[in-house]
Regions:
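Bacterial Sec-dependent N-terminal signal peptides
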Residues: 1-25
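Short N-terminal segments immediately surrounding and downstream of signal-peptide cleavage
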Residues: 23-44
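Start-of-domain marker
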Residues: 38-63
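Glycine-rich, compositionally biased intrinsically disordered regions
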Residues: 63-71, 85-87
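Acidic, glycine-anchored loop motifs typical of Ca2+
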Residues: 70-82
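Post-signal peptide N-terminal segment of secreted/secretory-pathway proteins
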Residues: 82-84, 94, 99
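Extracytoplasmic/secreted cell-surface and envelope-processing proteins
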Residues: 92-95, 141
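Low-complexity segments
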Residues: 99-169
Length: 169
């Protein structure tokens, strides 16, 4: 009888461990204060995005300590988080995702840059590119959107829609 109870307790304990291991471990980093958005100014991000020659150059500029663009420390380890840049392409739309690297295989989306090419019309000979920089609502609050205006279309925007272009990872 004692052996039966021990075996039953063992299986009950194993069941509890399996159930707790199945819980979703994905989570979002939530801003502790409203000032966290000051640590990465999306207008400054838009400025260096327009000045960059490609996405690799953009990522380097985001993380360059001499440029002082980012001061994010989302994992609160006392160091500025590295920002990586990813690209997702579909048709005439491109989404550039800026993610903070929090740890090994742990990333938090900070902002996205959404580009959409409008086809050339009779009134304009070249296609127009609409750009929106959208801050993560957990960090910047809801509806934090910046639409930059560039006097001259940045050179590398044309590369996004070339037949030989490969997305940046």
């Amino acid at each position: 009888m004692k052996a039966y109870k021990l075996i039953l307790m063992f299986f009950a304990l194993m069941l509890v461990n399996v159930v707790s291991a199945q819980k979703n471990t994905n989570g979002n980093v939530v801003a502790k204060s409203r000032d966290i958005s000051d640590n990465l100014d999306l207008q400054a991000v838009a400025s260096i995005f327009g000045d960059s020659k490609d996405l690799e150059d953009f990522e380097k500029k985001l993380n360059d300590p001499s440029m002082q663009i980012s001061n994010l420390d989302l994992n609160q380890d006392g160091y500025v988080d590295y920002l990586r840049v990813l690209e997702v392409a579909e048709g005439d739309a491109r989404v550039i995702v800026i993610q903070a690297v929090l740890g090994q295989d742990q990333f938090q989306d900070v902002a996205t840059i959404e580009l959409e090419r409008q086809r050339a019309t009779a009134s304009s000979s070249s296609p127009n590119v609409n750009i929106q920089i959208v801050g993560n609502p957990y960090i910047y609050g809801p509806n934090y959107i910046y639409e930059p205006y560039y006097y001259r279309t940045p050179v590398f925007f044309d590369f996004f829609w070339m037949p030989t272009y490969r997305p940046y990872y």
